[in-house]
Every structure is written in structure tokens, then in C-alpha cells.
Amino acid sequence: MKLNLQGKTALVTGSTSGIGKAIASSLAEEGAAVIINGRREEKVNQTIDELKTQHAEAVLYPAAFDLGTEEGCNELFQAYPEVDILVNNLGIFEPAEYFDIPDDEWFRFFEVNIMSGVRLTRRYLHNMIEKKEGRVIFIASEAAIMPSQEMAHYSATKTMQLSISRSLAELATGTNVTVNTVMPGSTLTEGVETMLNSLYPGENLTVQEAEARFMKENRPTSIIQRLIRPEEIAHFVTFLSSPLSSAINGAALRADGGLVRSVF
């Protein structure tokens, strides 16, 4: 299957690690030029060097901007005024007791998880609609429809992404612009691997053993009973970025390993 992404430029926010990095790699493999984003220039350049060792012909551009701020978004617009594919992957999460979350933490999660995507899409979607061609993808979470009591602030922002995505899809009615949301389940990113290593101190478990125990004890409804790999999410997002996905629009799409017990 050819995804026909040659000649397309994609921006993947938060793409120096985890799911974002895997998405950037997958898009580059399919021929898209990819803008690599992170807050630290050193990390951005390191990621570009790493991806070029995997994909020698890849066209990769650096974007060391803090997109959790209005200033950072404006700097990005000046550097890259137009893209064909926008993947709003940037996000923060942190388990916290609801009664201990201060107002400024709620605002921080809103600024990074919501306003980064709002600001970027406001600029880039307008150009896509004018051209009648483009792709916007929000990376949410299964927490959007199965909120977690241990991360109420995070879950709320993920639910909000679903509403924003659907509203924006309708703005592009009658064009070949699509706006969708992907909801990954628990995924084995670097941060999650670190968490697994700290969950069972003194038990000398391998990462695989800790993963199996975590899934059994904390994600019992998962059908696959393992953590999703970033590459699995990346392949799905790459397909949604391609012309082959033109009939999928305004959708909230689960890639959660069957974690959410629902037929819809």
C-alpha cells in the first residue's frame, strides 16, 4: 500500500520522544518532510540525527519552540507558515490527587494540552481550507472517554480535544480537509517505562514482567493485555495523514487495545 505522502510537509508537535517521535519517523519513512518540534534545540537536533540514521533520504526540519506558549506558537508560524499535515501531539500528564491540584496546574494543563493545538490549528487549518486539502490530527487518550480519578485535569483536556476536533472538521465541510482525533491506550513510552521501573521496587522484575503485572492489576479490561508500542499508534496516524483516509473525518478513533469496554 502506497500512502502517497511524497511532497507533503508535516508538523508533529512534541516529536522528540514517545508517540510523537514515532509518528515523525513513520511519516518520514513514507516520504513526507517532517518538522521536528521540542523545547530544547539540542534535543531537536539529536532527534533529527537519529531519524536520519533510520531514514537516510528523510527531509527533516528543526523547530525548537515551546508550543505551550503563545510566543512559541508565533515563532513557529514565522519559521514555517504553511504545512500540509498537522499532528497536535504535544501534551503533558501527571497523576495527582484531585483535591491537591491547584488552579495554576489546571491552567498549565489547559495551556499546553489545549491551547497549543487551538493556536496551531487556527493558523494552519485556515490555509488548508483555502487550498481545500490538508490533514489535522489530535492525539488524545482513552482517558477522554474513560476519565481517570487520578488525573482529572489531564482527562478533562483530552475530552475537550474531541469536541474541538469535531467542531473544526465541520468548518472544513465540502473540502478535502479532514480533522480527526486518535485516542491511544496506555503506551510504552520512555516515561511509562520509567514508571514501570519504579512501581515494584525490590522485586527485580524485568520491564516485560512489570508490564504484564501492571496491565493485569491496573488495566484489566485491556484485550491485548500489554502496553501499546508507539510505532503502532504512529502507523495509524500516518494512514490518517494520507489521501487514502479521505472518508474518515470528524471522528474520534480509539487505538486502545480494547481497553474501553464499548461497541461504539
Swiss-Prot record:
Its name, as the record gives it, is: Uncharacterized oxidoreductase YvaG
- What InterPro entries does the database record attribute to this sequence? NAD(P)-bd_dom_sf, SDR, SDR_fam
Q: Which PANTHER family match?
A: 3-OXOACYL-(ACYL-CARRIER-PROTEIN) REDUCTASE
Identify one Pfam family in the record. Answer: adh_short
Query: What does the entry list as the binding residues for substrate?
Result: 141
Q: Which organism is it from?
A: Bacillus subtilis (strain 168)
- Enumerate the active-site residues: 154
| Gene that encodes it | yvaG
Q: What is the lineage of its organism?
A: Bacteria, Bacillati, Bacillota, Bacilli, Bacillales
Q: Which Gene3D superfamilies match?
A: NAD(P)-binding Rossmann-like Domain
Family note: Belongs to the short-chain dehydrogenases/reductases (SDR) family.
